Amino acid sequence: MRIMPIVLANCRWSIPLMLERVHEASRVTHAHPRSQMACGLYALVTRNLLFHRAPGAAYRYAMEGARNLYLQEPWRDERRNFGRLLRGTLAEVPEREIGSNGYVVNTLEAAMWSLLTTRNFRDCVLKAVNLGDDADTVAAVAGGLAGVAYGIEKIPPEWIDALARKDDLLDAATRFAAMASR
């Protein structure tokens, strides 16, 4: 969940440098290579969404790149854990096969699947929540992707209006966006 600001602030950097920063951030609490790779895959999709690719294209392009980027150790041994994601066919997986129990691979798959099988912010987040189990984590990850894909103006206004300290949050987001666009 903390990866999104790193990608937003560093999306113009080279992909290897951006991934290095993302992996460093992951290691603070989740040092296993599998967790770092999950964060890297999330970052690659986010970066592609930022460059105005539609969700399906952003996902496929990111996975194509990931198959080439994660060839060396320690990533090579972890690739098998991300098979469904890396094949680029996650949207075809039936809902009953999508896990949402908080395990890093399942969380990433569930969030990405929610994005790929819906067409707007609201439906993406609700689909993620309705998978159950670790719904708040999956919805936060999916919501980050959907926010980049569809923009703040597509977030239901009643959801924004319900935020505690809404004005402070919107001000912080505006300042962050200005900093990230430099």
Language-model region placement:
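Active-site proximal loops enriched in glycine and acidic residues that flank catalytic Cys/His/Asp
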Residues: A128, A139-A142, W159, L163
